[in-house]
């Protein structure tokens, strides 16, 4: 899933994070108990996976309440969402994903607002998480995740 969360309203942003987590829980519940499949009918079952990768411009920093909400433990049998960067680089400073070149818009300077979050059951497949801080093609820097298939 790719996303671009609210920038101006923290309340709206937290509602978006809440809904992302609810969609993940719904997909996992359906995966565990898929129900009756009626192929080639309007009732054909489209199973959603319990594994999830969500990336994009989340418009929150790693110390924000929205970040804490995104990575908070999920009750029940739903796999938690983890930050891919922290999984690969647990002791490293986070690479900036915005404010590198556009200092007018980002008065705060270089910092992170873009992430790859994925389910904990994909963590062992992460090979690389990197940020290209050399390009000025956008006000955000490209972030890349490589997984073992």
For the regions a language model picked out, list residue spans one by one.
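Active-site regions of metal-assisted phosphoester/phosphodiester hydrolases
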Residues: 1-149
